[in-house]
Amino acid sequence: MAQQGQQGQMASGDSNLNFRMVAEIQNVEGQNLQEQVCPEPIFRFFRENKVEIASAITRPFPFLMGLRDRSFISEQMYEHFQEAFRNLVPVTRVMYCVLSELEKTFGWSHLEALFSRINLMAYPDLNEIYRSFQNVCYEHSPLQMNNVNDLEDRPRLLPYGKQENSNACHEMDDIAVPQEALSSSPRCEPGFSSESCEQLALPKAGGGDAEDAPSLLPGGGVSCKLAIQIDEGESEEMPKLLPYDTEVLESNGMIDAARTYSTAPGEKQGEEEGRNSPRKRNQDKEKYQESPEGRDKETFDLKTPQVTNEGEPEKGLCLLPGEGEEGSDDCSEMCDGEEPQEASSSLARCGSVSCLSAETFDLKTPQVTNEGEPEKELSLLPGEGEEGSDDCSEMCDGEERQEASSSLARRGSVSSELENHPMNEEGESEELASSLLYDNVPGAEQSAYENEKCSCVMCFSEEVPGSPEARTESDQACGTMDTVDIANNSTLGKPKRKRRKKRGHGWSRMRMRRQENSQQNDNSKADGQVVSSEKKANVNLKDLSKIRGRKRGKPGTRFTQSDRAAQKRVRSRASRKHKDETVDFKAPLLPVTCGGVKGILHKKKLQQGILVKCIQTEDGKWFTPTEFEIKGGHARSKNWRLSVRCGGWPLRWLMENGFLPDPPRIRYRKKKRILKSQNNSSVDPCMRNLDECEVCRDGGELFCCDTCSRVFHEDCHIPPVEAERTPWNCIFCRMKESPGSQQCCQESEVLERQMCPEEQLKCEFLLLKVYCCSESSFFAKIPYYYYIREACQGLKEPMWLDKIKKRLNEHGYPQVEGFVQDMRLIFQNHRASYKYKDFGQMGFRLEAEFEKNFKEVFAIQETNGNN
């Protein structure tokens, strides 16, 4: 029995052990599942906004590549999406498919990848969606989102300025903090009370390296999670940047780091090695004497970083927000009654400066390390476009706010204090830099500090992208600026990042530049010049505008109305200076010049055409107007009407005033042959009818027949002129070359003939003869009476000459009958439509001419029954 009881106890022990192991495994799996799966409201919000997210992602890189690198999508799926891009599928459509794939396994890691810093910089439209996710996270599970365990392994998506209440802060006090504490400046959110802020404290940092605790904090800005640890004299910094503009000073796990300043590595070394700066001890005594509460607090010289065991320089703390950052809720607040909390300064748009700090810090004296290297200094300068905070002047422990010794004028120059720098051990003089605070003037330039990257432990080397929300708050925090001794920021060893700025040309800026021109030499200082700390340099905005941009180009000459009139008079007199008023423009021979060449123009020859040689030079040679222009050296102008002059006047002016005829443009194909008649009398065909078309009797660009003297427009001839054919004969000459002896036949036989080339030529000749008649112009186009309903009731198919010409050129008539029927249809419709005598006679004459030519060309035998 005892043995059986012992075996039963062992079995029960094993079962309990197995049960505990299974419970622990299930607990771990539940925690992992809880960490991976998002709450239902956040998942639903993601699913409802997939279209907006896909629209914000405008290009594949870096979003798609980041998902592939984090194994959220497979390599095969990645190649599938790339193939879609190569097939010109819209990016938004492909991104929607990608988000649909992420929806299947949606979790916190997907949100962290989606709203990463790189993606928010590459796709600015994601910023608004990111803030919407923050609001949803805050509304549904604020405590879960701020859990200490969650801060290190998932992004924090609570909205800026909407943190937990003070109860959540009190719950954080009992949480154990690791020895490698992450120190940062505390931040009293609107939801926090000053009492809760006072209860938060960090233990002093011990040995070991600082932990890296990345966190995606909301509100946009720098997550100042610092790992400042003294391990054999070395300090390690692990900053983490966030994808927004506002600098957020927040501790890990909501643990207050107000005692970071009092327990900074520099002070620890000072306690071990003794304070090596007599000036610092004097400053500490002065601070104790000035402030009643200062007796209970340790003063911390932010400008005097101490030396570590290994002699490596410590980086000074940075209170400078990045460009475009807000200083909201991060101003001069003191917690725990022990050490002053760092203050952030911000520049309001109106030019006023919000309260910077609760106490006056001495930032002037950089210490020298054991190796002689200067310490990196603290920068308290605001970036461009930063906004003020509503809570700038609040104190958590009732600390006094000091009055400002320098203030920013609303419309004028800006005063900034310049402090002397001591020499380092190598005797090198450190450069001075002054912070210039600008008024809200269009086109005001930036100071050198706006382009300088923050070099403190919290901001280190990262940059925060600009955001539109960084410029929302403005004049609420306009006030005075505390007295801060500005130290040199040019010894940080980092290159200045130049920033392109829109070149403004407002009239107010230009006017201010002219008004303050007299003060330029007094206010501008050479770079690197040392100025005493008591002297203030007033720098006008006009000087700043001249630092970068100057108006390019030559200054324009301005003329009054009288000056313009005088110029016009001088110009008109100069144009008549070389005119010859004694020339008789009505004479048949006119003296002409082109450059240095002189000649005589014959009007009668010019009337024949522009290709006729009508200008005879002094040496007896004849030239066409174009050749004479080339002879005079004006070949590039290609306008002889302006290049060739008569008495100082161009030939165009003579043609416009009727002194000279405007010659027609005739294109000569080749040299004309002289035909010999039977009586051996020579006739020059070039001298007959060279200025008008045989069909329309109009000038212009004409083509000459190589056999006869007739000329035609390209489209007037039937068929159209073949310019490339050599020799080219008109249809009149071709009809003469056709066999003259034809047997007479009946009209019915002619109409039944097929449209062979010979019959095609005869039909074209008949139509051209009709066009040569003056009455044809009325029947060439569609008559307007076809649009009258009453007139068109008894008509057949509308027909006109151009329509027949088009069909004939396209060889649209298979027989001669079709051509003759269309011609007679024109006259039939005319007789049925027009009842007036004048118009009817016009149609009768043209019809009679056609019938006459038809019988002659086709040799139709007349009968008594047919006309």
From Swiss-Prot:
<dbReference type="InterPro" id="IPR013083">
    <property type="entry name" value="Znf_RING/FYVE/PHD"/>
</dbReference>
<feature type="zinc finger region" description="PHD-type">
    <location>
        <begin position="690"/>
        <end position="736"/>
    </location>
</feature>
<dbReference type="GO" id="GO:0005634">
    <property type="term" value="C:nucleus"/>
</dbReference>
<comment type="subunit">
    <text>Interacts with PIN1.</text>
</comment>
<feature type="domain" description="SAND">
    <location>
        <begin position="580"/>
        <end position="661"/>
    </location>
</feature>
<dbReference type="InterPro" id="IPR000770">
    <property type="entry name" value="SAND_dom"/>
</dbReference>
<feature type="modified residue" description="Phosphothreonine">
    <location>
        <position position="726"/>
    </location>
</feature>
<dbReference type="GO" id="GO:0001650">
    <property type="term" value="C:fibrillar center"/>
</dbReference>
<feature type="compositionally biased region" description="Low complexity">
    <location>
        <begin position="404"/>
        <end position="416"/>
    </location>
</feature>
<dbReference type="GO" id="GO:0003677">
    <property type="term" value="F:DNA binding"/>
</dbReference>
<feature type="domain" description="Bromo">
    <location>
        <begin position="754"/>
        <end position="857"/>
    </location>
</feature>
<keyword id="KW-0963">Cytoplasm</keyword>
<feature type="region of interest" description="Disordered">
    <location>
        <begin position="365"/>
        <end position="432"/>
    </location>
</feature>
<dbReference type="InterPro" id="IPR019787">
    <property type="entry name" value="Znf_PHD-finger"/>
</dbReference>
<dbReference type="Pfam" id="PF01342">
    <property type="entry name" value="SAND"/>
</dbReference>
<keyword id="KW-0479">Metal-binding</keyword>
<dbReference type="GO" id="GO:0008270">
    <property type="term" value="F:zinc ion binding"/>
</dbReference>
<keyword id="KW-0863">Zinc-finger</keyword>
<comment type="function">
    <text>Component of the nuclear body, also known as nuclear domain 10, PML oncogenic domain, and KR body. May be involved in the pathogenesis of acute promyelocytic leukemia and viral infection. May play a role in chromatin-mediated regulation of gene expression although it does not bind to histone H3 tails.</text>
</comment>
<feature type="domain" description="HSR">
    <location>
        <begin position="22"/>
        <end position="138"/>
    </location>
</feature>
<feature type="compositionally biased region" description="Basic residues">
    <location>
        <begin position="494"/>
        <end position="512"/>
    </location>
</feature>
<dbReference type="InterPro" id="IPR004865">
    <property type="entry name" value="HSR_dom"/>
</dbReference>
<dbReference type="GO" id="GO:0005739">
    <property type="term" value="C:mitochondrion"/>
</dbReference>
<dbReference type="InterPro" id="IPR001965">
    <property type="entry name" value="Znf_PHD"/>
</dbReference>
<dbReference type="InterPro" id="IPR030411">
    <property type="entry name" value="Sp140_Bromo"/>
</dbReference>
<feature type="region of interest" description="Disordered">
    <location>
        <begin position="486"/>
        <end position="580"/>
    </location>
</feature>
<dbReference type="GO" id="GO:0006952">
    <property type="term" value="P:defense response"/>
</dbReference>
<feature type="compositionally biased region" description="Basic and acidic residues">
    <location>
        <begin position="268"/>
        <end position="301"/>
    </location>
</feature>
<dbReference type="InterPro" id="IPR043563">
    <property type="entry name" value="Sp110/Sp140/Sp140L-like"/>
</dbReference>
<keyword id="KW-0238">DNA-binding</keyword>
<feature type="compositionally biased region" description="Acidic residues">
    <location>
        <begin position="384"/>
        <end position="397"/>
    </location>
</feature>
<dbReference type="InterPro" id="IPR001487">
    <property type="entry name" value="Bromodomain"/>
</dbReference>
<feature type="short sequence motif" description="Nuclear localization signal">
    <location>
        <begin position="495"/>
        <end position="514"/>
    </location>
</feature>
<keyword id="KW-0862">Zinc</keyword>
<feature type="region of interest" description="Disordered">
    <location>
        <begin position="260"/>
        <end position="341"/>
    </location>
</feature>
<dbReference type="InterPro" id="IPR010919">
    <property type="entry name" value="SAND-like_dom_sf"/>
</dbReference>
<protein>
    <recommendedName>
        <fullName>Nuclear body protein SP140</fullName>
    </recommendedName>
</protein>
<keyword id="KW-0103">Bromodomain</keyword>
<dbReference type="GO" id="GO:0000981">
    <property type="term" value="F:DNA-binding transcription factor activity, RNA polymerase II-specific"/>
</dbReference>
<dbReference type="InterPro" id="IPR019786">
    <property type="entry name" value="Zinc_finger_PHD-type_CS"/>
</dbReference>
<dbReference type="GO" id="GO:0006357">
    <property type="term" value="P:regulation of transcription by RNA polymerase II"/>
</dbReference>
<keyword id="KW-0539">Nucleus</keyword>
